[in-house]
């Protein structure tokens, strides 16, 4: 029997591993199967918010296919804006050289130094003149940094979020990015919150996810 359609849940997680396992559990047990515009079957839960209290410990879930070397490379590309593996684009390029014009991470750092309570330390990856005309578009859309209680916190919006394959790498990279920004600004890194409009797992990951969920329930 198909799950009743449901939108919106909040997870308060201790660390990245805890966030991943609990997110997979919600998607698997409360998501619905759809066929996406590319013809792939996914199991999807809409509007999943995950608040990670300490994203600096237990960053690599035991069951992920990502290892530390690959994760470090991913984080380096995110922070530096380099395209080490010759992708069509990287998040780092969009953050560091948006539309060939703006280093948004440098802007965020300077904005927070200038005005620690600013609500304008926001970086986006979507470029409408480009992304409305191509096949490969960013899943991570927005990164917002705020200093509160003497720490800089990060909220990230994903329009589409591959929880099975990409979430561990995304969060590892974001935790490193937040540490980088915090060091440059001169404050401690804080909480990371992700908002995933479409949190999903692809059909090729269903067996893996089912086994993981069985193991944690």
From Swiss-Prot:
An example Gene Ontology molecular-function term: thymidylate synthase activity
Highest taxon listed in the record's lineage: Archaea
Pathway(s) this gene product operates in, as recorded in its UniProt entry: Pyrimidine metabolism; dTTP biosynthesis
Biological process, per Gene Ontology: dTMP biosynthetic process; dTTP biosynthetic process; methylation
InterPro entries in alphabetical order: Thymidate_synth/dCMP_Mease, Thymidate_synth/dCMP_Mease_dom, Thymidate_synth/dCMP_Mease_sf, Thymidylate_synthase_arc
Subcellular location, record wording: Cytoplasm
Active site: 139
SUPFAM superfamilies per UniProt: Thymidylate synthase/dCMP hydroxymethylase
Keywords: Cytoplasm, Methyltransferase, Nucleotide biosynthesis, Transferase
Cellular component GO terms, alphabetical: cytosol
The EC number(s) this enzyme carries: 2.1.1.-
Chief location of this protein within or outside the cell: cytoplasm
Short name of one Pfam family: Thymidylat_synt
Keyword check for Amino-acid biosynthesis: no
Function: May catalyze the biosynthesis of dTMP using an unknown cosubstrate.
Family as reported in the entry's similarity comment: Belongs to the thymidylate synthase family. Archaeal-type ThyA subfamily.
Assembly with partners or alone: Monomer.
The protein's name in its UniProt record: Putative thymidylate synthase
């Amino acid at each position: 029997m198909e799950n009743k359609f449901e939108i919106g849940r909040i997870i308060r997680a201790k660390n990245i591993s805890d966030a991943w396992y609990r997110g997979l559990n919600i998607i698997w047990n409360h998501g619905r199967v759809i066929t996406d515009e590319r013809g792939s079957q996914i199991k999807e839960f809409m509007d999943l918010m995950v608040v990670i209290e300490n994203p600096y410990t237990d960053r690599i879930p035991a069951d992920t296919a990502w290892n530390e070397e690959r994760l470090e490379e991913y984080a380096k590309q995110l922070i530096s804006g380099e395209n080490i593996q010759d992708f069509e684009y990287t998040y780092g390029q969009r953050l560091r050289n948006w539309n060939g014009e703006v280093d948004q991470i440098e802007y965020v750092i300077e904005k927070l130094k200038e005005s620690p309570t600013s609500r304008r330390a926001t970086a986006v990856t979507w470029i409408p003149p480009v992304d409305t005309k191509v096949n490969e578009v960013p899943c991570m859309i927005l990164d917002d940094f705020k200093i509160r209680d003497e720490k800089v916190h990060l909220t990230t919006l994903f329009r589409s979020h591959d929880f099975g394959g990409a979430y561990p790498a995304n969060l590892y990279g974001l935790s490193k990015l937040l540490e980088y920004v915090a060091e440059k600004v001169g404050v401690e890194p804080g909480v990371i919150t992700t908002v995933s409009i479409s949190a999903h797992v692809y059909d090729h990951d269903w067996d893996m996810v089912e086994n993981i969920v069985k193991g944690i329930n």
